Amino acid sequence: MNNRAGRVFRTCISISFVIVFAFTSFGQAVNRRQLAEQVKTEFLHAWNGYKEHAWGNDDLKPLSKSFHNWYAEPLLMTPVDALDTMYLMGMKGEADKTRKYITDTLKFDKDIYVQNFEITIRILGGLLSNYQITGDKKLLAMADDLGTRLLPVFDSPTGLPYKYVNLKTGKTRGEVTNPAETGTLLIEFGTLSKLTGKPIYYEKDKRALVETYDRRSPIGLVGTNINVETGKWTNTDSHVSAEIDSYYEYLLKCSILFGDADCQSMWQESITKINTYLADEGENMSKKNVNGPVVLGELWYGHADMNTGKRTATTTGALDAFF
């Protein structure tokens, strides 16, 4: 093949690749748009059902077309949860009306005991994310008010948070809790500190996270349940399933979000230990590089006693499998 023929051949091949890539990319883009519209349609179906049958309450019960509230008084769980999704889907008109309803209606001066963990990740987190999207200072003021009402949970002898707090009186209860509820708060409380300039939120929850980590076993694992007044474990089953999973998740996320070196160190140590004692497939080890340990992902994670590493279960759940 002479030079001219070679150039023509290479040009034709290049054009072919460009055409294939263009049509493939176009098809993928169209498919993504179609999928996005399908998701939006399903969201609207659920949202309109909530508006028709459960407006002003926490949740829709779709089969009975009625509503459910988590506590004696509603806290608008669904509207707060859904608001940032509306903005991300481009539903600004509906979102603005919902935001006004939330800021006009939702009050926290209620004589009810709430679960600190759920209220933090759903209501406090929802208010903060929507403030960051909209810049509506009413949302930040509401988050600050709620955060202040939640702070008494940290007033235990250990600094580990109680499970429940009364939003009006500040009284607490629920001394037996779990690592997910003691260690899955720092993103929300830390963000509240950054946005309000009040370090107390970050400091209180950072201490709770560290106190949880410091009570790990000699082989580096945490248990399922702990007493916040004594600091003693009441259930030594260790795993990455419900009641523990998000504790590990927040160690990593907080190291990234806040650049917290302590969280990074706790994460690296923790993931190494759970890969050593809980992972069922793969090499069960960490490799090293110049920047520190590189943890190998595993397919299955089991349950083991936090002190001995001896297996305590023979079944695996979804969270264990996809950690």
Residue ranges of predicted features:
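Glycan-recognition and catalytic cores of secretory/periplasmic carbohydrate-active enzymes
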Residues: G27-F322
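Intrinsically disordered low-complexity regions specifically enriched for long asparagine
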Residues: A5-G6, F26-Q28
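Bacterial N-terminal signal peptides that target proteins for export
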Residues: N2-I15
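Intrinsic-disorder/low-complexity regions
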Residues: M1-N2, L319
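Bacterial N-terminal signal peptides
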Residues: C12-T24
